[in-house]
UniProtKB/Swiss-Prot annotation:
<dbReference type="InterPro" id="IPR002300">
    <property type="entry name" value="aa-tRNA-synth_Ia"/>
</dbReference>
<feature type="modified residue" description="N-acetylserine">
    <location>
        <position position="2"/>
    </location>
</feature>
<dbReference type="Pfam" id="PF24810">
    <property type="entry name" value="RBD_LARS1"/>
</dbReference>
<feature type="short sequence motif" description="'KMSKS' region">
    <location>
        <begin position="729"/>
        <end position="733"/>
    </location>
</feature>
<dbReference type="GO" id="GO:0005524">
    <property type="term" value="F:ATP binding"/>
</dbReference>
<dbReference type="InterPro" id="IPR014729">
    <property type="entry name" value="Rossmann-like_a/b/a_fold"/>
</dbReference>
<keyword id="KW-0648">Protein biosynthesis</keyword>
<dbReference type="GO" id="GO:1903432">
    <property type="term" value="P:regulation of TORC1 signaling"/>
</dbReference>
<keyword id="KW-0067">ATP-binding</keyword>
<dbReference type="InterPro" id="IPR009080">
    <property type="entry name" value="tRNAsynth_Ia_anticodon-bd"/>
</dbReference>
<feature type="modified residue" description="Phosphothreonine">
    <location>
        <position position="142"/>
    </location>
</feature>
<dbReference type="GO" id="GO:1990825">
    <property type="term" value="F:sequence-specific mRNA binding"/>
</dbReference>
<dbReference type="GO" id="GO:0002161">
    <property type="term" value="F:aminoacyl-tRNA deacylase activity"/>
</dbReference>
<keyword id="KW-0597">Phosphoprotein</keyword>
<dbReference type="InterPro" id="IPR009008">
    <property type="entry name" value="Val/Leu/Ile-tRNA-synth_edit"/>
</dbReference>
<dbReference type="GO" id="GO:0004823">
    <property type="term" value="F:leucine-tRNA ligase activity"/>
</dbReference>
<protein>
    <recommendedName>
        <fullName>Leucine--tRNA ligase, cytoplasmic</fullName>
        <ecNumber>6.1.1.4</ecNumber>
    </recommendedName>
</protein>
Amino acid sequence: MSSGLVLENTARRDALIAIEKKYQKIWAEEHQFEIDAPSIEDEPITMDSEELHRTYPKFMSSMAYPYMNGVMHAGHCFTLSKVEFSIGFERMNGKRALFPLGFHCTGMPILACADKLKREAELFGKNFDNVPAEEEEIKEETPAEKDHEDVTKFKAKKSKAAAKKGRGKYQFEIMLQLGIPREEIIKFADAKYWLTYFPPLCESDCTSLGARIDWRRSFVTTDANPYYDAFIRWQMNKLKAAGKIKFGERYTIYSEKDGQACMDHDRQSGEGVTPQEYIGVKIEALEFADDAAKIIDSSSDLDKSKKFYFVAATLRPETMYGQTCCFVSPTIEYGIFDAGDSYFITTERAFKNMSYQKLTPKRGFYKPIVTVPGKAFIGTKIHAPQSVYPELRILPMETVIATKGTGVVTCVPSNSPDDYITTKDLLHKPEYYGIKPEWIDHEIVPIMHTEKYGDLTAKAIVEEKKIQSPKDKNLLAEAKKIAYKEDYYTGTMIYGPYKGEKVEQAKNKVKADMIAAGEAFVYNEPESQVMSRSGDDCIVSLEDQWYVDYGEESWKKQAIECLEGMQLFAPEVKNAFEGVLDWLKNWAVCRTYGLGTRLPWDEKYLVESLSDSTIYQSFYTIAHLLFKDYYGNEIGPLGISADQMTDEVFDYIFQHQDDVKNTNIPLPALQKLRREFEYFYPLDVSISGKDLIPNHLTFFIYTHVALFPKKFWPKGIRANGHLMLNNSKMSKSTGNFMTLEQTVEKFGADAARIAFADAGDTVEDANFDESNANAAILRLFNLKEWAEEITKESNLRTGEITDFFDIAFEHEMNALIEKTYEQYALTNYKNALKYGLFDFQAARDYYREASGVMHKDLIARYIETQALLLAPIAPHFAEYIYREVLGNQTSVQNAKFPRASKPVDKGVLAALDYLRNLQRSIREGEGQALKKKKGKSAEIDASKPVKLTLLISESFPEWQSQCVEIVRKLFSEQTLDDNKKVREHIEPKEMKRAMPFISLLKQRLANEKPEDVFERELQFSEIDTVKAAARNVKKAAQALKIAEFSAISFPYGAKTGKDIFTGEEVEIPPVTKIVENAVPGNPGVVFQNI
């Protein structure tokens, strides 16, 4: 539970929750969210899907279905809210909007936890009460009434001392810490129990949020639902038949001790770690340094006629032209290993990996012939392939580690910040490092040009970050990321055979050239440490496996074509997908342990969890017709059993063939299934966290283009950032964590939904602020109370709408309606909330204050429109207002989204903004007039009556107009940022006032449309506006007693002007600075005691 905001008085929240519960029940009874395709009776099966969509508009969105090893938390809810808001909005656009949600159970976490509990029950009894003595300090927490956390990922809140004592050591202890009663825990030793326990909780939690989910279409994955099981078998068979699933050698995390692949469930640490591919660069030793030569010469086991290669692991083969030396660690013990026709010099750990990758004479043999301390190699003369320098030296680098790569690092100071700063350090202190200056004194060779950092990326970034030493580890890590990203995405080769090509294109070509020339080879190791449960430090081995051939060229082209046609909502998302599509290769499709579907042609394997979750959205379209419960136990309305769902039947549904020869399913039933699919597909948008781009979402694209006709390829993907809670990372261990259930219990559904909408819409991390949720409770409750009271109010005005503030309020409502619509359409829910609630309510507040007595028709429209604008985000509140306050007989869920009642008059809105700014200026001027200056009294005596005078300029000063023209000219020539050119157009005597004004114009151009900046003529009559709102202007002052109010209109620079109320010519008050600053749209404000 979050240790954040504590709610003192919950009466308002409880009143809103009562409304929410009431309408959730009504919506369920009305089957509001059960959305069907047009029936075959309505439209014949022969109607093309595109025509069907034109006649009956639809929208389908989904999120990555949650994993059933716990309940949903606020982070899940943030993703869910994006689907929710889009579904709510599209319903109001007249579309059949479908939001289905399933329950993912595939994989190892559930079974691994269940098996742990089985073992612990054997050790400690079914009640887990025979714990060894040293564990008896474990205390059972008082069970919470409902507190179902993700029990496979819990981090107990314990001190270091408690941790050392073993608290949380066993799975049953984690369950106890979560508040699950001891006597209930044994049930979780059966993996099936998890599948019955968590899905109903997920449904009830989502329902409590008011989610518009069609629960008829929900299901669990794995063979626990035989229909979904048949669907995944069909998917696997189709992919295999299409040549997308293959069998062969694949780089795999492997435990030598266990003699088998080490999958996630077998790991003590390193879950999710995959093989990292490097290029092993063979750097030939030409002449060993004396100390190394003595050791090598003294060994009779070495064949001196063979070549010796230092093997450097690199991710950047395209930079090899710029090698200036090669680094080893003076403190690492290196081995000289038999590599067949040559010797490799590397760490034993690296050669162990190589020995399982067909890179050595004998699999699994990695004993060194000779070991040599790294410092003995310093000064060794070498030849680095592709380098512009034929001879280089081995030099020391203290930051090289033995647990990453090969312990040998090739030096490219042009593009590696680490190499650049180390080279610089060696040059400054050669005596300290025991090297000769000429060994390091090589000119840095520019290899590629980048847009931001020029030809020497590393040097530029090191200087930008002010990195002083190789010991600046954090800065160097940051610099390395920047350098790699800039080089890869913006770099162009300026050296070598691929000069002029983009780095991302040249990279693989250089790699292929080096491998073909025998200068390098592909080498893999775990991307970070993986420890097996047996305590083995795992390696990477080439193993025979079934795998999906992602990255295959023709398939990849299809995936790219699909991506190009998608709406992705943010350029960063497209960049991320393009990066993944560039590197993603084959992926193991199966495992031997866990829950899931058996591989149809090799049933000792299970389809792994990322492979059975790629096209489940298509299964949503037909699920409700096949079964009535999550598990497929109860046959659905079409009377089709799971064993009738053959591959041939799925082929018909998903339009791979037009008839089914071998089935006893009636044709009308088959047609109904096909109709549901062809109506709701393609999926309009899939919404997930951005962390799923490298796997789940990319697999989603690949599998869709492989299995469905082009017209059914997905139309959009939205990736959101992670959710923070109160500006801190969500974490169970710190207590800064909330489940979906807790969020709704604490704030109610609508207030929570408003806080989720306000959290953010970009791919950057968002923030759920509890204070915003709490403020939403007060805002909604007060709005509800006001709406109830005002609709009973008998003193509201009626008749024609002619008053300025009536007209302005109507136009402002219309403008905000259109802005809100636009932001919903763009899926910018934070902005939709701003315009549709905060600004809309502020418009009402200003109207209420300005008008004196409000107009009944406008207030009725405001209340209805407010309910409709909020309906996608806060549907319970909207429903209450729509039905109970306004008396509508139908649901707001079926209402149309409001649109402007008439074209928006921009002049009226400009006049309204003018008045607001004028009132603000009067209050600010009042504050200045009352402020006591040093050694003097205030300009105005607040105890005496005051005259307020507005000085309304009819024209702009000539010098400003000239500045505007200068800016317009330079802006069109794209030279406005050149201050020298700006100054050339300004007379010296005008410089002092012109430059700040031009700076202001430049700032406006950065945030506004150019035409709005350059067009200075007002869209309204300033004089008419002041006359119409004279009473309001006079009341703007708060501390002063305004006894008289006048307004003088005058041409800029004149000494006299016209009183706009009497028409008399009058003198302008002698307030030089105020008069000079007055321009059209920004009058001067003068206070005088009378």
